């Protein structure tokens, strides 16, 4: 009888150890998957898809004749990169609002996820990575040009359609143009891929 009890106890312990080993293996596998997700720019957070961040690649080429002064001298340019939940308020945002921090925040309201400023220098290129949450729908880019050409001081991109190839733009004397990324048509028509017709005012 005692021998049978010992055998039963040994069997139970063996099952418990096996179960723990299997659990540890599953935990290790889960950790490995998590590291792969982070390495590919996807941060896994349970329960709320809006908290899953992806990396958006943005490249900006600053032309040699960047943000020209009244005498034709190239100047630096402050570019602003916006991660947005929607684009309606960005569409309505005016140039004076964009250049004033408080007015800018008030104009964009709850649509604004984040904004980042980059100082561009003539003839330089910039590779920028934006963290974009799942509830964001657009990437906005605006430039504080000295004398902006009409609506060409800002661009808007559909972020979900732009992840694969990223966003590439050019910054010039008084305007932006876009070469990569899916533009939001009612803010940035396809004509914004070219500088044809752009005339800078002194």
Regions found by a protein language model. Give the residues of each.
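A short, structured loop/turn motif at beta-sheet edges
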Residues: 48-52, 131-136, 161-163
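Bacterial N-terminal signal peptides that target proteins for export
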Residues: 1-9
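Glycine-rich, aromatic-bearing surface loops/beta-hairpins
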Residues: 155-202
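Gly-Asp-aromatic-enriched flexible segments
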Residues: 57, 150-154, 158
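Bacterial Sec signal peptide processing site at the extreme N-terminus
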Residues: 14-40
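Solvent-exposed, flexible loop/coil segments flanking beta-strands in beta-rich domains
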Residues: 31-59, 194
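Short amphipathic, basic-aromatic surface patches that mediate peripheral association
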Residues: 58-70
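Mid-length scaffold segments of soluble, non-membrane domains
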Residues: 74, 81-152
């Amino acid at each position: 009888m005692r021998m049978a009890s010992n055998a039963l106890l040994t069997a139970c312990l063996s099952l418990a150890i096996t179960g723990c080993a299997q659990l540890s293996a599953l935990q290790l596998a889960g950790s490995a998957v998590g590291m792969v997700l982070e390495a590919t720019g996807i941060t896994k957070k349970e329960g709320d898809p809006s908290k899953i961040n992806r990396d958006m690649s943005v490249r900006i080429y600053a032309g040699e004749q960047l943000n020209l002064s009244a005498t034709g001298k190239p100047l630096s340019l402050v570019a602003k990169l916006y991660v947005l939940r929607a684009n309606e308020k960005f569409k309505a945002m005016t140039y004076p609002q964009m250049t004033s921090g408080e007015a800018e925040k008030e104009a964009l309201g709850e649509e604004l996820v984040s904004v980042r400023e980059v100082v561009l220098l003539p003839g330089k290129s910039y590779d920028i990575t934006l963290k974009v949450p799942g509830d964001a729908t657009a990437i906005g880019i605006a430039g504080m040009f000295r004398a902006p050409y009409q609506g060409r001081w800002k661009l808007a991109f559909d972020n979900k359609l732009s992840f694969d190839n990223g966003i590439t733009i050019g910054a010039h004397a008084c305007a932006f143009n876009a070469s990569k990324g899916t533009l939001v048509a009612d803010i940035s028509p396809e004509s914004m891929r070219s500088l044809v017709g752009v005339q800078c005012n002194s």
